[in-house]
A protein has these predicted regions:
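Domain-level signal for soluble alpha/beta catalytic cores
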Residues: 1-374
């Protein structure tokens, strides 16, 4: 694998096949064993990877088929974190998710054989004889775990009981994450993407007004905290490990959680986060314009999420090319790439598309990119 710019990509989660959905439900109802569920997961992941390769993707994922949520499953794999059921799920535009959370149960630390490492090991095995593709592992950003631990009054109370000194909390989260990243590396992973909704909350005035009510943070102060959490996990990593981040505004059942352009956070996250590339949502008016890209340091990559994963309708190819041209005013064209705005299934429910729609979106990404970057 090289760090050469690849001009087409996906965010990585894919619609769960009905066979997998049925098996997960049967497992929850104690009708099948965990071993049987794992066999179904393995089979459907193998089918997905073959499909990704057939479509022409050069970076493949397991579709997050072993996860229920894009973020919580990773949190639950750390020591000192437990799975809890809050009163409410996450609130999206016109919809509420299932109610699950992660709370502190002790000192947060990394535990060997983390579920994400197990998942990646199987993915790596599937492509071991194919030098033409790279296996990627997506994990939620360290800052996302911090936010979850202060998600509501219940979580805040428990977190403060275990961690009255928040500096120790920040240090433990970053350390646990760095050890996860290094363990993934030691198992052959050379491409890790941090999925991160924390910045999307800061840019949304409605979210920010609620979040800032306790007066503990200014917008700049919170951004400094998120950078410390994320960059703290990314220190002294191997040179041949590619680290990227996807900045998201929520993606559940084709709905969204937050809105706002990147301007309020661009000078922090674009200029200072220690990643190789930013996967950014620009699929509708909620995302604002490309002007904040002026803060991206020269040489870093930006993957333009201008093809929505929330709706089946296909974008006009010429309009996509024009938008790429507009973005190139702020980032060199050779450092730009194209992808869908988010994954197709950030949770196991998935967005309101068919697998055929999903495939058509990916084909549009690849075809458009090949015409732009000839």
């Amino acid at each position: 694998m090289t760090k050469d710019v690849l001009h087409y990509d996906t965010v990585g989660s894919f619609l769960r096949p009905e066979k997998l959905k049925q098996a997960r439900q049967e497992f929850l109802e104690n009708k099948i064993s965990r071993e049987k569920l794992k066999l179904v997961e393995n089979e459907t992941i193998a089918d997905l990877v073959e499909k990704e390769k057939q479509l022409g993707l050069k970076v493949v994922t397991d579709g997050e088929f072993r996860r229920s949520y894009w973020h919580l499953d990773t949190f639950w794999g750390f020591g000192g974190i437990e799975h809890t059921i809050p009163e409410h799920g996450y609130f999206f535009h016109g919809e509420e998710t299932r109610a699950d959370s992660a709370t502190v149960s002790g000192k947060i630390h990394y535990v060997e054989n983390h579920p994400d490492v197990q998942a990646f090991s199987y993915l790596k095995e599937l492509i071991k004889d194919d030098d033409d593709v790279t296996a990627r592992q997506s994990i939620p950003a360290p800052a996302q775990l911090y936010v979850e631990l202060f998600r509501d009054e219940h979580n805040k109370k428990i977190t403060n009981e275990f961690y009255p000194d928040h500096k120790k909390l920040v240090a433990d989260i970053s350390k646990a994450y760095r050890e996860l990243i290094l363990d993934l590396y030691n198992h052959g992973c050379r491409d890790i993407k941090l999925d991160d909704c924390t910045w999307g909350v800061i840019v949304d005035d409605d979210f920010w007004n609620v979040f800032s009510e306790d007066g503990k943070y200014t917008r700049d102060g919170l951004q400094d905290l998120y950078l410390k959490l994320n960059n703290g996990a990314l220190v002294d990593l191997p040179e041949d490990l590619r680290i990227t981040t996807h900045i998201c505004r929520g993606n559940y059942h084709s709905t969204w959680a937050s809105k706002g352009g990147y301007e309020p956070v661009a000078a922090h996250v674009f200029a200072k986060e220690n990643v190789d590339a930013f996967y950014l949502e620009f699929d509708d008016e909620r995302s604002g314009g490309f002007e904040p890209l002026r803060f991206v340091p020269k040489g870093k990559e930006v993957v333009l999420g201008i093809i929505t994963s929330k709706k089946p309708e296909l974008e006009d190819k010429e309009e996509l090319k024009q938008r790429i041209k507009e973005a190139a005013k702020y980032v060199d064209l050779e450092n730009l790439a194209l992808s869908t705005q988010c994954g197709f299934a950030s949770t196991e429910e998935g967005n309101k598309l068919t697998e055929e729609d999903q495939e058509a979106k990916i084909k549009l990404v690849i075809e458009t990119a090949k015409e732009v970057w000839k």
